[in-house]
Amino acid sequence: MKKIAFVFSYVPHGVSLGREGLDLLLSVSIMNSKISVFFIGDGIFQLLKNQKPDEILSKNYVLSFKILPFFGIYDFFLCNESLKERGLFKKTDFLLDVSILSAIEIRNKLKNSDLIINF
């Protein structure tokens, strides 16, 4: 099986990329079990707890990220530099058990992927 990396780099609300990425991630997980998910830049907000998208008339799809382990997806990585730039530091701020890596470590992991899909 190919190693597939999904990279989320956009905010969860105001654009549909996050929702589309999550939909594709769930679809691909049925056929492939070597999936890693990376959150860089504003993409780190995809996993942030206690979001209230209904206040901006948006749907709260981010809670759906919590079902990914049931689909055999366990490798979630957040960019440490992105966290610091946005004032987020605690792993407990996020919906999933994540590994926090430097940008260089993320780049090295992405190099080992056969396919990289960015949302």
From Swiss-Prot:
Supply the alphabetized keyword list. Answer: Cytoplasm, tRNA processing
Q: Does the keyword Cytoplasm apply?
A: yes
Gene3D superfamilies with a match to the protein in the record: DsrEFH-like (3.40.1260.10)
The record ties this protein, via InterPro entries, to:
DsrEFH-like, Sulphur_relay_DsrE/F-like, Sulphur_relay_TusC, Sulphur_relay_TusC/DsrF
For the biological process aspect of GO, one term held by this record is: tRNA processing
Per UniProt, what is one Pfam family of this protein?
DsrE
Q: Which GO terms describe its cellular component?
A: cytoplasm
- Cellular location(s): Cytoplasm
What PANTHER family has UniProt attached to this entry?
Answer: PROTEIN TUSC
Which NCBIfam families has this protein been placed in? PRK00211.1, sulf_tusC_dsrF
Q: How does it assemble?
A: Heterohexamer, formed by a dimer of trimers. The hexameric TusBCD complex contains 2 copies each of TusB, TusC and TusD. The TusBCD complex interacts with TusE.
Protein task: Part of a sulfur-relay system required for 2-thiolation of 5-methylaminomethyl-2-thiouridine (mnm(5)s(2)U) at tRNA wobble positions.
What family does the database annotate? Belongs to the DsrF/TusC family.
Q: What is this protein called?
A: Protein TusC
Organism (species)? Buchnera aphidicola subsp. Baizongia pistaciae (strain Bp)
Gene encoding this polypeptide? Answer: tusC
